[in-house]
Amino acid sequence: MALMQATHTIEGFLAVETHPRAFVAENGHVITRLSATKWGGWEGLEILEYSGDGQVEVSDEQLAEAEHASQIEAQIIAEAAAE
């Protein structure tokens, strides 16, 4: 476990962007920008930049999950752009 400086809020929860387009939130969820759209319904989950002193506790497992999610999302975006 490591404490990381929060970079965003997602629906009011502090979160840190650990990999491109992938976040670990203080509630333990790993969220990508695409999954935020899926989970949030039509309008998506609100992701806002954060510049306060808050920190998020992140485990090695969450970091690995966020890295994998980031890679999957990058692949989806690349495939969509190629069509």
From Swiss-Prot:
Superkingdom classification of source: Viruses
Record-given protein name: Gene 3 protein
Source species of the chain: Mycobacterium phage D29 (Mycobacteriophage D29)
Gene for this chain: 3
